[in-house]
Regions:
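N-terminal Rossmann-like FAD-binding beta1-loop-alpha1 element of flavoenzymes
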Residues: 385-411
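Ferredoxin-type iron-sulfur electron-transfer modules and their immediate structural context
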Residues: 6-381
């Protein structure tokens, strides 16, 4: 089957020599589209082990990742689908603008200390009137859209009459009281615009209940947290796109300041790895996955570019994500409140790509051919040597993958 890049078929994507040719075509395209970037990248790729500031490497990767994304999109002829993914991300921006600029900055300060607001019928009617401007939009998105429009009106009214400013102020106050009322209401508990990090108590991380008064040693988990097995159906309720993007926006993109402790760990002044209150070392991701960089690409609406970044250090990411480890979360810069849920974001990025046309094949290609991986940008041909891998857990199958890319024949047993 011919691909979207002239001269390549789908079968070629499994042939090491053709992957090398594909890498050359990619490089020619970047050199033509962005010569300065290609010169910088070529110098980096020529000596990947040379000492460089971490921020410089991060900058190169996040600038090159969109080129990889566009090239792969063209290769599989899915430009329309990737544009749709970007538009879907952009459509959520209103939610997070409202969450930060209105709810966090204007509403939360009014409810600190347990103060309960008083919502009048007039306030409720005002909010209904504001939301009615977005018919056919589900309630959370409509509230966010109405709130953002109201903030825009407020900015425009600064140069208007006293009556205009007073009318906008009255609407804003009504919306503030409405949000404060429903901030913790059962009906809106799942809304991302009302989900904010809670303080972390290190000695109460696991919620328990003691159902037997005369047997305090009997402990059970909250009923709402239980997953009841039904045959062989998947009971893992991974996050939806809104919750994933909520935590992407929660991340402060520490890589730009070389403070991405989720990747590099938290260190004492003497260079030793810090430990939390439970004595757990905060070493960060054991794979040194470029987490903050992934978040930046995903925030920009480019899940394919984000996955390309992930697969440099974690090519077997379908086996990680929220299923295995959370070392990155433990070392997140947020130590006194809930951390960014990086594993859920990683799973979300992978899932977004798998949902694209040819998604599984795209993921597979990125594990064999990835220009961002300057140490091994494409798989090598068979070198005549065979290796037996015993044990196919996460370490075993990852080792097998890397050996295959280095040209070894691999037999795995478990």
């Amino acid at each position: 089957m011919p691909m979207g890049v002239d001269g390549f078929s789908y079968a070629d994507l499994h042939v090491p020599a053709r992957l090398r040719d594909l890498h050359a075509v990619f490089g020619q395209g970047v050199a033509a589209a962005d010569p300065p970037l290609w010169r910088e990248w070529s110098a980096y790729a020529a000596s990947p082990g040379a000492p460089r500031p971490a921020t410089e490497v991060s900058d190169l990767i996040v600038r090159m990742a969109p080129h990889v994304s566009r090239f792969v999109s063209r290769l599989f002829r899915i430009d329309e689908a990737t544009a749709g993914a970007a538009a879907g991300t952009q459509a959520l921006d209103t939610l997070f603008r409202f969450k930060v600029d209105f709810v966090r900055r204007r509403v939360l300060p009014t409810v600190k200390g347990g103060l309960k607001p008083s919502l009048s019928e007039a306030d409720a009617a005002t909010v209904d009137r504001l939301v009615a401007a977005w018919p056919g939009t589900e309630r959370e998105a409509a509230v966010a859209a109405a709130g953002c429009a109201l903030m825009d009106r407020e900015a425009a009214a600064k140069g208007g009459s006293d009556a205009e400013r007073a009318a906008v102020a009255a609407d804003i106050d009504a919306l503030k009281r409405w949000c404060a009322t429903f901030l913790h209401d059962a009906a809106t508990r799942t809304w991302v615009i009302f989900r904010f990090p809670e303080p972390v108590e290190p000695f109460a991380l696991v919620q328990i209940e003691r159902p037997c008064q005369d047997q305090p040693e009997v402990m059970i988990g909250p009923d709402g947290h239980r997953r009841r097995r039904d045959g062989f159906g998947l009971t893992d309720a991974r996050w939806d796109a809104r919750n994933v993007m909520s935590d992407v926006h929660y991340c402060v993109l520490c890589h730009e300041r070389d403070k991405d402790t989720c990747t590099k760990g938290i260190h004492e002044k003497d260079g030793k790895i810090s430990k939390n209150a439970l004595g757990i070392p905060l070493a960060g991701c054991p794979l040194d996955e470029k987490i903050s960089e992934m978040h930046l690409l995903r925030k920009a609406g480019d899940p394919l570019g984000a996955l390309a970044i992930v697969t440099v250090d974690n090519p077997m990411c379908p086996g990680t994500g929220h299923r295995i480890c959370n070392d990155c979360m433990k070392a997140c810069i947020y130590q006194k409140q809930e951390p960014v849920n990086i594993p859920q974001i990683e799973t979300g990025v992978l899932t977004d790509v798998l949902r694209l046309p040819w998604g599984v094949e795209i993921y597979g290609l990125l594990t064999r051919w990835n220009p961002l991986n300057v140490k091994r940008p494409y798989a090598l041909p068979y070198n005549g040597k065979n290796v037996l891998v015993v044990g196919i857990g996460p370490a075993g199958y990852t080792l097998a993958h890397h050996l295959l890319n280095e040209g070894f024949g691999v037999v795995a047993v478990d």
